[in-house]
């Protein structure tokens, strides 16, 4: 596999200058230091968390759902040149209490958040610490490999978090049918089986139809409330709610659909939820928990799931654009009639 790559001294980097504008600027291609890899970025998935940088500007080339090829290794690295793979967002230290427990998403001494603090997947090249690189097989399409990150990783981790509190659920509701919500729905189906009831609520028809293709039962909130929908379909409630919206109205309304012993999982950052501790939590033994990204050690399991269910999972990807059309890609994504949108280069 090992081979030599011609690495230019400079390359065109997309720069988010604010006001929804992106310009390309020549920058020097960085050198990897000890323990670091230089990645030639080949695919990056758009995410709603990119939008603040699109609006306000960023000092780096962002993109945290990055898949690419190792083209150079720094001193002490062992990854072969030419290896394809994906980049785990969090530059975990590997030495703190959390990391020693395998809880790399809870590292207390992170060295980077790739795509937020350091150049990410929209850049032509990015430098990462070797420990955040996860290799994939040569036959894997790198655009599809990005699903190992926010789609599969975040989705599956949230389900595992729920199972820690409710190991025998009979139903699940996802709030929000954006890419993260679609990922949660897909991973729920793969975790619990095709006959397990997975409901998903949103107001955008395009995304709800996509969720139906994944096997979820869609709830169009423009037509009825959650309570009305469940009453019409003789559903008393659900055992798990996973909120990907971060919106108070979504959290409040969906929490009221939880059964006894139900688990409410907050995946989306954002707004608040107000609860009556006695009535909402204690009496019914419900739990409200958070779920942050996922752990690096979950990648191997998710990769096996990906290999076995590739055709099913890649339905989440609905649009692909070359890096030269990154502005058009964000315009399409902002319109919300998409699933996962991928930039390729």
Describe the residue ranges of each PLM region.
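C-terminal hydrophobic helical "lid"/dimerization subdomain
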Residues: 1-9, 205, 252-253, 296-345
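Residue-level marker of beta-strand positions
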Residues: 13, 65-69, 83-84, 98, ...
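Glycine-rich beta-strand-centered segment in the early N-terminal region that forms part
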Residues: 28-44, 54-97, 132, 137-140
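Mid-domain Rossmann-like dinucleotide-binding core that forms the NAD(H)/NADP(H) cofactor-binding site
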Residues: 82, 140-224, 229
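N-terminal Rossmann-like NAD(P) cofactor-binding module of classical short-chain dehydrogenase/reductase
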Residues: 86, 239-242, 265
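NAD(P)H dinucleotide-binding glycine-rich loop of Rossmann-like/cofactor-binding domains
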Residues: 93-175
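A short acidic, Gly/Pro-enriched loop at the edge of an enzyme's catalytic core
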Residues: 230-241
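Glycine-rich phosphate-binding loop and adjacent beta-alpha segment
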Residues: 248-308, 345
């Amino acid at each position: 596999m090992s081979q030599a790559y011609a690495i230019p001294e400079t390359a065109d980097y997309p720069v988010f200058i604010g006001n929804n504008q992106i310009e390309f600027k020549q920058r020097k291609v960085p050198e990897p230091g000890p323990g670091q890899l230089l990645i030639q970025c080949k695919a990056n998935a758009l995410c709603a968390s990119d939008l603040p940088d699109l609006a306000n500007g960023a000092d780096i080339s962002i993109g945290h759902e990055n898949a690419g090829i190792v083209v150079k290794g720094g001193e002490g690295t062992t990854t072969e040149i030419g290896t394809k793979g994906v980049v785990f967002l969090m530059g975990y230290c590997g030495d703190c209490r959390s990391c020693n427990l395998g809880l790399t998403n809870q590292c207390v001494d992170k060295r980077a958040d790739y795509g937020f603090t350091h150049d990410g997947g929209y850049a032509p090249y990015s430098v990462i610490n070797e420990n955040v690189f996860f290799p994939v097989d040569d036959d894997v399409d790198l655009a599809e490999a990005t699903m190992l990150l926010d789609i599969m990783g975040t989705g599956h981790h949230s389900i595992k978090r729920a199972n820690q509190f409710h190991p025998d659920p009979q139903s699940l509701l996802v709030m929000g049918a954006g890419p993260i919500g679609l990922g949660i729905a897909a991973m729920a189906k793969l975790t619990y089986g095709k006959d397990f009831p997975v409901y998903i609520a949103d107001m955008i028809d395009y995304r709800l139809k996509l969720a139906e293709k994944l096997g979820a039962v869609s709830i169009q909130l423009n037509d009825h409330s959650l309570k009305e929908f469940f009453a019409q379909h003789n559903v008393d409630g659900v055992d798990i709610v996973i909120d990907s919206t971060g919106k108070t109205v979504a959290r409040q309304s969906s929490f009221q659909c939880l059964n006894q012993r139900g688990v409410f999982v907050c995946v989306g950052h954002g707004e608040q939820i107000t609860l009556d501790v006695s009535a909402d939590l204690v009496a019914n033994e419900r739990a409200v928990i958070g779920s942050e990204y996922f752990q690096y050690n979950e990648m191997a399991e998710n990769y096996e799931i990906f290999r076995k269910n590739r055709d099913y999972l890649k339905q989440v990807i609905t649009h692909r654009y070359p890096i030269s059309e990154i502005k058009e890609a964000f315009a399409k994504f902002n319109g919300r009639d998409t699933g996962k949108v991928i930039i390729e280069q």
